[in-house]
Amino acid sequence: MPGWRLLAWAGARVLDRGTGGLGTALGSGNRTDICVLVRSLHGKSGTWWDEHLSEENVSFVKQLVSDENKAQLASKLCPLKDEPWPIHPWEPGSSRVGLVALKLGMMPLWTKDGKKHVVTLLQVQDCHVLKYTPKENHNGKMAALTVGGKTVSRFHKSTSILEFYQELGLPPKQKIKMFNVTDNAVIKPGTPLYAAHFRPGQYVDVTAKTIGKGFQGVMKRWGFKGQPATHGQTKTHRRPGAISTGDVARVWPGTKMPGQLGNVDRTAFGLKVWRINTKHNIIYVNGSVPGHRNCLVKIKDSVLPAYKDFCKNLPFPTYFPDEDEKELPEDLYDEEVCQPGAPSITFV
């Protein structure tokens, strides 16, 4: 049912007053009358579905939804009702699934040789596998796993999306990403993913949408020098100048010109993982990553050929806390990191 029809039907239940209500408009087939009624529901006086909710009622509804989401997430930590999918060993050329994490910010970190490194903190919040697509229905070469991260309110999701999550038994997610995986790395939908999916010392690729700067000129967008500031130059100082030649009589595609700066997907390749906090699911990666604070990023094993060998000793296809023989410590460090609390100087 289209959105305007659903809204008109719901409004008719409240505002229909006999022959002059929505029934007459529907019978006449005049869509304009229906739109007028729909617009009346969104007047300055407020909407008819939440105008009578008090602050106490709103807080009660939010608490009720939060408790339901926690119950759904806790049920996924229990053994599944049906048989789990088989786990295959790692093979050369295998490709694992990635994670969806929240960018918290940046902080310094020191290695044992005294060098300072700036790292970015990425927190994995309620990350689950949502859907499995076989390679026959994807691209014919690799299968695909759809992963969702960070639970959000269900009041702003459509009915079809809520039905999809209801079948999975999971609350709705804010960000959904798709990862190409090999057949031996597929994971059952509904499986939770943790920061321990990665290990300190390996290299990852982080993808996110860069910070939007709006419409900018060529000097800020591309680093052009601009025009002279003195010596008779008065008409322009920040324009690009000539953008083509007279013989060509056209502007070549791809010419650097003013336009939108930022707000596009960019990937930072080959970032080293220095530390992992298993209690709060925080990954410490080297350097900066695209995006602003509190944005959701996509993390996966690095595709750079120089770092392919680091995928041999990783949890495959992912980290399962129930099947791990010994419990992981709260913090996992790279062997080069100077751990907090360790002496800075050791006399031999």
UniProtKB/Swiss-Prot annotation:
Keywords: Mitochondrion, Ribonucleoprotein, Ribosomal protein, Transit peptide. One of its GO terms (biological process) is translation. Residues 1-40 form a transit peptide. SUPFAM superfamilies: Translation proteins (SSF50447). Disulfide bonds: none annotated. Its main location: mitochondrion. GO terms for cellular component: mitochondrial inner membrane; mitochondrial large ribosomal subunit. One of its GO terms (molecular function) is structural constituent of ribosome. It is found in: Mitochondrion. Component of the mitochondrial ribosome large subunit (39S) which comprises a 16S rRNA and about 50 distinct proteins. PANTHER family: 50S RIBOSOMAL PROTEIN L3 (PTHR11229), LARGE RIBOSOMAL SUBUNIT PROTEIN UL3M (PTHR11229:SF8). Belongs to the universal ribosomal protein uL3 family. This is Large ribosomal subunit protein uL3m. It comes from Bos taurus (Bovine). The lineage of its organism: Eukaryota, Metazoa, Chordata, Craniata, Vertebrata. The gene is MRPL3.
